[in-house]
Amino acid sequence: MKKLSLAVFNTQPPHLYFGGVERRIVETAKRLLSKVDTRVYCGTKAGFKKTALVNGITFVPCFSTDALFPLDNWFFNKTLSRAVDAIKADVYEAHTVSGYGFLKALRKRKILKPFIQTIHGVLADEYAQSFRGDSPTFRAKLANLIMWQLSRIEGESAKNATLIVTVSKYSSEKIVQFYGVDKAKIRIVTNGVDTQKFRPAQDLGEIKHQIGISNKQCVLFVGRLIPRKGLPFLVEAAKHIVKERSETAFVVVGNGPLKNHLISYLEKINLSGSFVFLGDVNEGMLAALYNCADVFVFPSIQEGLGIVLLEAQATAKPVVAFDVGGVHEAMLDKETGLLVKPDSRELADVILRLLSDRSLRERMGRKGRVFVSSNFSWDVCAQRMLQVYREALGDIA
């Protein structure tokens, strides 16, 4: 059978960034190399200027900007809208709102090509939830306001797409609720995790020493530093935690518009010595950091699924998260971790409970790895996406 040609659109270059969306693109494409010729069209960020071939996947730069989301996305889509004749494929797939410019140009010219919109977190839902937490910086407030406009674009793209893929039942319901899309167009394909890369490891003293947390218990957060990810809740919880367990280190992986505000606030409340901000890290370092953690905390106030929850559980770590969105689909409450309502004091209480009970941490960690290994596989994700591509083409067997 002839290989299917697929054009994927994503603002961030997946071979240079290690966010959940980017990992999904790479892991899926790697597993479909024999059946799908994937070309990923992505923004010119992090110095990405020339077409690259990595692990059999072609990455093509399209002019954007190094500015933060959503400005980078706007420039990227402007570039794509002018490239309809240049980008040829059997099927097109856009992640989040990274391809609306291309889709709009296709429809305007009445070119009926299969177009799949993959929605990870529903932007209209994200906007609705964004005012539950603080948005203390001008840039964060501006991003929330622009999110409203982007949610309208996402809704329009969802209506015009051939099929919609999303990562959880929760997100599927929100797409119907906010965008009025026919449920029959939606396919749920959950994210996966590479349980060989993310697995329990021992002897991580060197890593802990390297980041300055030797002989301390580690509470780990991984995610973008934006209001939706809820890091201010963890900062407030830390006030209570350090009173009872002063030798606790809070390690933060990721970047975003809240970073400088959070650092300033921690200095103001004399907690800067308890927090370590590492910025973005590569996949190998990320796996090591999961293993350094005693507890993984995910205080997001809106989430489609939460791939970092899967990775933490794959490394046999207990997870703590807010009971919002599709988070409950990514973990087992009271078995692989603990769910609480969005409240900093409740968050502090369950973190303290886990920090003080090693046997509970180990028991939940073991169950977490079994849960993820049994239910979240990139192999399954890739095969289901292949079915979606073929369905969009109309030739599914």
Region spans (language model):
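A conserved mid-protein helix/loop that constitutes part of the nucleotide-sugar donor-binding site
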Residues: 23, 27, 217-240, 250, ...
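Acceptor-binding helix/loop patch of EC 2.4 sugar-transfer enzymes
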Residues: 110-155, 196
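Carbohydrate-associated surface elements
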Residues: 170, 192
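Nucleotide-activated donor-binding/catalytic signature segment of Leloir-type glycosyltransferases, i.e.
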Residues: 263-281
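Short alpha-helical donor nucleotide-sugar binding micro-motif in glycosyltransferases
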Residues: 280-281, 288-293
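Aromatic "clamp/platform" in nucleotide-sugar-dependent glycosyltransferases that forms part
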Residues: 301
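Short hydrophobic beta-strand element within catalytic cores of glycosyltransferases
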Residues: 309, 318-321, 331
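Conserved acidic donor-binding segment of nucleotide-sugar-dependent glycosyltransferases
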Residues: 333-334, 338-345, 353-359
